Swiss-Prot record:
The gene is fapR. CDD domains: hot_dog (cd03440). One of its GO terms (molecular function) is DNA-binding transcription factor activity. This is Transcription factor FapR. The keyword Cell inner membrane does not apply. Disulfide bonds: none annotated. It comes from Staphylococcus aureus (strain Mu3 / ATCC 700698). Gene3D superfamilies: Hotdog Thioesterase (3.10.129.10), Winged helix-like DNA-binding domain superfamily/Winged helix DNA-binding domain (1.10.10.10). InterPro entries: HotDog_dom_sf, Thioestr_dom, Transcription_factor_FapR, WH-like_DNA-bd_sf.
Length: 185
């Protein structure tokens, strides 16, 4: 059932407030209107496009991390609960893929996961001690990879972090990281 313009606009605002990472395409499917209509409604509501919403959320999250600088982070940090869990997203661009196949280079997915582990741990010095990783599915040009990291254990010198990365709802990468930390810096 299609909503009247005012009700649709309010519903769009509520959807974006509850999930700032929802795409115009997903909104258009949800409200059964064209993507152009969604864009006009967002403009009327002064709601920025997805990339800008992601950047705004990421900027707030970078204030919570101490072990890595924003410009060193791979992807955009979209959620962080220090020493507990964190999420990032990474858009796969032409610089990130093999040109012949359009498949993402493995070190790009590893770098996203690794920098997420470093950012997750709120200590002055955090280094990767060891990792065990698996590439599950191919990641392609223009995919958006969402990495989720969570601390599974902590000792006097190490955090043990599990990372799972997804494209939409498909698991594409997983890894276990043993992260050394030093409180002295």
């Amino acid at each position: 059932m299609k909503l009247k313009k005012d009700k649709r606009r309010e519903a769009i605002r509520q959807q974006i407030d509850s999930n700032p990472f929802i795409t115009d395409h997903e909104l258009s499917d949800l409200f059964q209107v064209s993507i152009q209509t969604i864009r006009l409604d967002r403009t009327y509501l002064n709601i920025p496009e997805l990339r800008k919403r992601i950047k705004l959320v990421a900027e707030k999250n970078y204030d919570q991390i101490s072990s890595i600088e924003e410009q060193e982070f791979i992807g955009d940090l979209i959620q962080v609960n220090p020493n507990v869990k964190a999420q990032s997203i990474l858009d796969i661009t032409s610089d990130s893929v093999f040109h012949k196949t359009g498949i993402a280079r493995g070190h790009v997915l590893f770098a996203q996961a690794n920098s997420l582990c470093v950012a997750l741990i709120k200590q002055p010095t955090v280094l990767t001690h060891e990792s065990s990783i698996q590439f599950i599915e191919k990641v392609k040009l223009n995919d958006t990879v969402r990495a989720e990291a969570r601390v599974v254990n902590q000792t006097a010198k190490h955090y043990y972090v599990e990372v799972k990365s997804y494209v939409k709802h498909t698991l594409v990468f997983k890894g276990n990281f043993k992260m050394f930390y030093d409180k002295r810096g």
